[in-house]
């Protein structure tokens, strides 16, 4: 046996005695020739074989997991991100790593942050600034808020030189210095459709109005940016809409668009994960996309 294991007989005997001392019972019956296993020895060998099998199975899983042949990835986003931004990223990731099981959760920012903190999500995509003591983040892209005004509002007739052609929004030409922001105070008497104050867009929109020395006439408060835009399209009121969303949805001639002051309307869209959370290979590869 020692020769088959490529070790000396004394070394093999010492190892056997060490195991017997550890378990408290003899493995071999030394009164027989050749040596035979005791009842305890038989069970010990079976247990060792099971342990070795489990170890080999896990090593196989770890090798597959490292190559992204197994694993899960749970993503979260608000209505805007889960509807328009995350699906093409998920589709691309699934093409590259078809054996990874992907889940997408659509919720409010507050609920997504709670789920992320409790380990129910791997990553969330959002425009809000979350607590850096709890969450880590990576910038995905920059977004710019635009003023969306129902085309039937008479105020548009006095602001034609500030109106943004759709192609300038899609090409981001409106970000050039040659394109001036609209004087926002001209809209102080108009009705606004705002997102709720706890939403980053709602919070930022109110700040923009306050910085322009007026309180907006809010007739409706919504939870989702897409909903507020649809209400603007119906002609009810003015909304603040991100250029990312406008690049994804069908634009309509029933709405007129205006540039807002850059320093107030620009923000980062970020992927967030919980501080101290072990980053799986699936998370790492998704963040590289």
Where are the predicted features?
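N-terminal winged-helix
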Residues: 9-10, 60, 66-114, 129, ...
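A short LG(V/I)-centered, amphipathic sequence patch enriched
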Residues: 20-39, 59
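Secondary-structure junction motif
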Residues: 155-157, 162-212, 279-280, 287
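Short beta-strand-centered segments that line the small-molecule binding cleft or hinge
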Residues: 89-92, 110-166, 236, 256-258
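Hydrophobic hinge/microswitch elements
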Residues: 108, 112, 117-120, 127, ...
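A late-sequence structural motif
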Residues: 85, 243-245, 254-289
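Residue cluster at the C-terminal edge of the helix-turn-helix DNA-binding motif
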Residues: 4, 17-26, 96
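Alpha-helical linker/hinge and terminal dimerization helices associated
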Residues: 22-23, 44-66, 286
